[in-house]
Every structure is written in structure tokens, then in C-alpha cells.
Amino acid sequence: MSFPYFISPEQAMRERSELARKGIARGRSVVALAYSEGVLFVAENPSRSLQKVSELYDRVGFAAVGRFNEFDNLRRGGIQFADTRGYAYDRRDVTGRQLANVYAQTLGTIFTEQAKPYEVELCVAEVAHYGETKAPELYRITYDGSIADEPHFVVMGGTTEPIIAALNESYTENASLQDAVEIAVKALSASAEGAEPRSLGPSTLEVAILDAGRPRRAFRRITGAALEALLPEQPQQADSGDKPTE
């Protein structure tokens, strides 16, 4: 008599967690950080059509890593939820904390009830309404529905340890936009110990902000010449042909 294959609930959860973590780690990293005028998103993303950063509502932004089709479904669902609530009640009733809680409940249900968890990690950010003075809010939502309120910055995807270490050393509160971009890009360029730092330019970065100084819709993408002007100068490699003759 053969017995059916049995796996304990604890083992099943461990295997699901490992699957999700590996899928998220395969992606490229995203940094979201608070600066003097709002929230800055910087994602390592060479694709111009598959975007990791987007607007959810008037004062709320979204960033994600992992499987694109999975986090894009969540993004669209969040937009629909926000639009419906804003229409039924008031636009100010739509908050980042509310959307983060909805995402946490959704991912928690998927993790426990479906055969395969979503291989995604999300960040929901919100800035104060125009004329208000409230600190930006950053929420990290993981694949199992866990939610955390981050005071300064969020790092997701790829190898996060060197990026977090770089931000712990270089992050400053109330930095200007130019300084914040430099801090984020240098942190994203950080590599594991012993490896050379990578060079990131406009063609490999997706950059956007939530600008608390904008009257209604705070979200704005930064591309082209505006992005080039904000990026730190790349070090020039020495060329033997340019050396002066002795």
C-alpha cells in the first residue's frame, strides 16, 4: 500500500518563501528615498516600456521588483481601487497607508492560499497634500503580505546588502533633488565586496519623483536632458593616447 506524499505546513511555507525570495533577487534593484521636496524613485531598468515605477493616485506612488506580470496586475488593481474610492468618497480619502494595507492583504492571501506565491516586493509612497507640511510616508510590502513603515528609504530587488550599506553611510535627510539622485545612483552602483562599482547612466535608469510642491498630481517622471543634468558625472578612464609626452 502506497502512502500519499506528505509535506508539513512549515515546510510548505519555507519552500514558498524560498521561491519568492529567489525570484525577487534575480531582478534589478529599486531605491525609494525621502528628500526635501518629496520622494525619489530610482530603478535600474534598461527597458523603456516595462516600467517599475508609476503613479497610483494624486499623492501616491508605486515601485516594484520581481515578476513584471504579477506586480503590474497589482499596480492596475491599486489604481482601480484608488479611483473607485476617490470617486465614491473624496480624493483626500485615498492614502498611501490604505493602499499599502490593501496590497498586504492581497499578497498575504495569495501566499497562504494559492499554489504559487507572487515573486514581488512593493513600495508604496505618499507625500503631503499641497500646502501641508507632513513628512513623506514609505511602506514596504513583501511577498508574504508583511508590511513595514520605513522612515527614510526602501531598497528592493537584486543584491540589497551593499546598496543598504551605501545608503546607511551616505543618506542625509532633507537633501536636494540633485543630491538625492546622486546618493541613490551611487548606492545602486555599489557592488559586493571586492567587485568593481558599476556605471549607471540615463539609458539604464528609471527615475521619478513625488513632488509635494505640485498642486494636485505629485508624480512626475524625469527623463532625457533633465535626468542627465541630475546624474553625477561618471569618472573618465585614463587613455594612454592622451598622456602628455615627456
Curated annotation (Swiss-Prot):
Pathway assigned in UniProt: Protein degradation; proteasomal Pup-dependent pathway
GO BP of this protein: modification-dependent protein catabolic process; proteasomal protein catabolic process
Keyword Plastid: no
Keyword match Cytoplasm: yes
Any one of the GO CC terms: proteasome core complex, alpha-subunit complex
Keywords from the named record: Cytoplasm, Proteasome, Ubl conjugation
Result of knocking out the encoding gene: Cells lacking this gene are viable and grow at the wild-type rate, but show a large reduction in the rate of degradation of the pupylated substrates. Cells lacking the Pup-proteasome system (pup/prcS, prcA and prcB) completely lack pupylated proteins and intact proteasomes; they grow as well as wild-type during the exponential phase, but they show reduced survival after prolonged incubation at stationary phase (17 days after inoculation) and become hypersensitive to nitrogen limitation, and, to a lesser extent, to carbon limitation.
Mod. after translation: Pupylated at an undetermined lysine residue by the prokaryotic ubiquitin-like protein Pup with the help of the ligase PafA, which leads to its degradation by the proteasome and thereby constitutes a negative auto-regulation.
Compartments, record wording: Cytoplasm
Gene3D superfamilies: Glutamine Phosphoribosylpyrophosphate, subunit 1, domain 1
InterPro entries documented for this protein: Ntn_hydrolases_N (IPR029055), Proteasome_alpha (IPR050115), Proteasome_alpha-type (IPR023332), Proteasome_asu_bac (IPR022296), Proteasome_sua/b (IPR001353)
Stimuli inducing this protein: Up-regulated under nitrogen starvation (at protein level).
NCBIfam families reported for this sequence: 20S_bact_alpha (TIGR03691)
Function: Component of the proteasome core, a large protease complex with broad specificity involved in protein degradation. The M.smegmatis proteasome is able to cleave oligopeptides after hydrophobic residues, thus displaying chymotrypsin-like activity. In complex with the ATPase Mpa, degrades protein targets conjugated to a prokaryotic ubiquitin-like protein (Pup). Identified substrates of the M.smegmatis proteasome are the pupylated SodA and Ino1 proteins.
Protein name: Proteasome subunit alpha
Species assigned in the record: Mycolicibacterium smegmatis (strain ATCC 700084 / mc(2)155) (Mycobacterium smegmatis)
Gene: prcA
